[in-house]
Amino acid sequence: MLPALIIFCATYLFLAGAEVPFLKLDRPGGAVAGAAAMVVFRVLTPEQVYRDAISWDTIVLLLGMMVLSSVMARAGIFRWVGWVALRRAHSPTSLLAAVVVVAGALSALLVNDTICVMCTPIVVAMVEAANLPPLPFLLAVAFASNAGSVATLTGNPQNMLIGTLSKIPYAHFTAALALPAILSLACVHLVLRLAFREQLRERRRLDVDVPAPELHRGNAIACAGALVFVVAGFVLGYDLAWTALVGSALLLVVTRGPPREIFAQVDGVLLLFFAGLFVVTHGVAQAGIAERIFRGIEPVLGSDALQQTIRFGGFTVAACQLVSNVPFVLLAGQWVPHFADPHLGWLGLALFSTLAGNLTPVASVANLIVLELGGRHGKVPFFQFVKVGAAATFLPLVVGCACLLVERRLGLLPGP
């Protein structure tokens, strides 16, 4: 157990962003190094790593969704959607609402991190053309992509993990969390509108003459068809990973352009990060460490399902600030089956771990992407981000959690 414990602590130290002298490991590097150490120190055998540790379903699902998003970006769909939003916005506040709705909806259909990569440069160009302050709109992309992604199993990486671990059907998951996600988006818009009311107070009508971006109609139609095919497959209960992979493969066949350029936009580092985390977490489980951690927090959580949901939600928000949401969900996924109501526990974990990403700049990859891509407009001070992020975290959490518990009380939650 001791080697596994040391490797676990060292790995999660890197996941928390700690800097170790003479070591330049970042989060993905720390995860891969931890995975290798689990094998070197015989916590796991190579056969266990290949056969048991890595969730290939999650890796394949993430790969398929990233390829699908990449093809849609090359077709010009995201630029065209941004142009339509800018043309139809009549004021700064209506443009802010459009950014929240578009980022949230696209993140529910695709993967929020990818949406941030694709949409942030478009939003920057939009606000420059409209001569508007960029900060409210950049935060709208980050916060709304997190909030909107709550709604589906494919909205973000941690939801994909929850889907793999819990076996909750896509349709059941969305039926339970669609309304909390919509209400969370409304809360995000309200928070941003109040926080930046001085900058958005202009009453002038937006009249921006921006030429329409190039839209490859044939490829766009193929992308729309593939997206309908994939979502329909999800709803009908087909295997998520292979449905996404088949949909993306069909797009590669029917669209123009070399696949190499599409694959170049796939985040291979993220896939390696996931693989490393899977191995480290499996080693922790094999050594019994995860079970001991749960025994330590179990008395605090209580035995009632309602108590467990609320208290574990608070614990989740705090833990996600330390190690980010994906590593925490991998660890917490071993505890939820022991809850009084595991089905509610999985849904609560998805809600809390995702919305926790709005609290600090490092709490979610989506935040880091938006701040990096929008960085030429100046850095966002940490405490200014937290000031707005706290409201964009806790208000949606209170509203979303209350909605989820009311659904459970009324018997509206689909069964596991």
Regions found by a protein language model. Give the residues of each.
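A small-residue-rich subset of transmembrane alpha-helices
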Residues: 273-274, 349-372, 392-400
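Re-entrant/interfacial helical elements at transmembrane boundaries that shape
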Residues: 81-82, 114-126, 138, 152-166, ...
